[in-house]
Amino acid sequence: MPRRREVPKRDILPDPKFGNVDVAKFVNVLMLSGKKSVAENIIYGAFEHIQTKSGKDPLEVFTAAILNCKPLVEVKSRRVGGANYQVPVEVRPVRRMALSMRWLREAANKRSEKSMPQRLAGELLEAAESRGGAMKKRDEVHRMAEANKAFSHFRF
């Protein structure tokens, strides 16, 4: 157990355009080398693409995409008697959010569209409809947890 006091979580300020904390978090996930304005431009560009492509509210698409990509369970390695077991564990809410955002970013990076705003818009639209690379990743993690259900008694 740590002897020091627990460090409080910092509050993230909502993003300037939409006033949404989740969008601000996603800006931070997307940001490279501290270039926040570039990350903001990518996200706002993606939101414009979503608006023109589908005619839906970009914030609703964004929240639906994140909600759909959140994993419920994942596997963690646990060493028991000289053997490593993949033990399924429930994912904490903060980590759920972080994983879904990370998977959306990685899936958007792997897409073939020309610019990052277009790739991100495509991935968000697909994830909102429960398909796409990020959803594939979530389903893969769920499958791993399901396959290793027998080891769930090795709790952490």
Curated annotation (Swiss-Prot):
GO terms for cellular component: small ribosomal subunit. The keyword tRNA processing does not apply. GO terms for biological process: translation. GO terms for molecular function: rRNA binding; structural constituent of ribosome; tRNA binding. The keyword Ribosomal protein applies. InterPro entries: Ribosomal_uS7, Ribosomal_uS7_bac/org-type, Ribosomal_uS7_CS, Ribosomal_uS7_dom, Ribosomal_uS7_dom_sf. SUPFAM superfamilies: Ribosomal protein S7. Keywords: Ribonucleoprotein, Ribosomal protein, RNA-binding, rRNA-binding, tRNA-binding. One of the primary rRNA binding proteins, it binds directly to 16S rRNA where it nucleates assembly of the head domain of the 30S subunit. Is located at the subunit interface close to the decoding center, probably blocks exit of the E-site tRNA. This is Small ribosomal subunit protein uS7.
